[in-house]
Amino acid sequence: MISINKIHFGDCLKNFPKIPNKSIDLIFLDPPYNLQLNKELTRPNHSVVKGVDQEWDKFDNFNSYDQFSKEYLSECKRVLKDDGGLWVIGSYHNIFRIGKILQ
């Protein structure tokens, strides 16, 4: 069991199984953005986006990224109180995929 009335940092897929159903008021997520770039990507203002080349942000394809997202979002749904809040940050590379899964 995880202690209550505290802010917990960590991997939700490792920590959430220790948390009872419908017991969390707020979840703040900063998930991987899936930013492995095979070519140059620019923002609308033409500045270059730097990709991420670290293991925690590597996925085989969009399906594996979506599956990973479904796993942690399912756990969020399980532990959030009925009137709880979910705050997910992202970039325009991933936030719409996460939004679709949330719907």
Language model features: what each stretch is:
Residues 1-103:
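S-adenosyl-L-methionine-dependent nucleic acid methyltransferase catalytic domains
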